[in-house]
Amino acid sequence: ALYKKDFQSIGGHDPLYAPQSKEDSDIFNRFQLNGYKFVQTWEGCVYHMTCRGSRYNPTLTTVGKESDEWLAQNNKSARNFIRKWGHFVKHTDTMKPIVPKRYDVGFVAINCDEYRLMLLEPWCDTIYTDVPYDRYIQAEQKNTKFNLKKKLKRYEDQKTNDVIVEFDASKLTTQNFEFFNMLQLMLEDSGVIGSVEFDIFKLKVNNLKDYGRGLIDINDKWYLEKLV
């Protein structure tokens, strides 16, 4: 429970996730960054309005099977959460949000292709690549409010991000791909300006400015400039 004014002061739920999925994790991250204190009770009871969505809609799927519609929306919202926060949902065992600092990260990916581009794009603020990306933008832009024309750049374009990560996309594996989910935490823990190598990745850290507060209010200028 919280006061209505506190909910409204940060713009309420982010329509980025409409109609559902990850909007709750997003707003709890924003509550925490805005200094709200969390109190958990085992004596409360909240009715969750089950079976009102499309997850197990018997008109869309068989009983007990998640509908393709729900799975597609869940994946769409997960990708948008990563685009916004730079990582997937993180929390403690008691569900308290873990919110790493939010850095400005650019990927420089050689030997890329459209499939790898689809996997990589959400995890950075800018991606400089050697694969043509117009077709990807045309297919993916309808799934996000983030401006993909601003985000995708040619390999030879000037690299302007605070943190640059260079790698050969053809060498990505299931194991080393987890690097992207941990990158914001790793940068925060290291606090090091300069160049470093890890596995297939070459990092050039020019600045460790934290942009996290720009994600609290959905009307913040820094955040809005990333959207269409």
Q: Can you say where each PLM-predicted feature lies in the sequence?
A:
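Alpha-helical elements of Rossmann-like donor-binding domains used by nucleotide-donor carbohydrate transfer enzymes
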Residues: 26-30, 76, 80, 182
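Short, solvent-exposed loop/turn segments at secondary-structure junctions
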Residues: 7, 45-46, 114-115, 133-135, ...
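Histidine-centered active-site/metal-ligand motif
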Residues: 48-50
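A short, conserved alpha-helix in the catalytic core of glycosyltransferases
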Residues: 1-11, 16-45
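C-terminal, non-catalytic tails of nucleotide-sugar-dependent glycosyltransferases
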Residues: 1, 37-38, 54-115, 119-130, ...
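Short, well-ordered secondary-structure micro-motifs within conserved domains or adaptor modules
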Residues: 153-188, 200-201
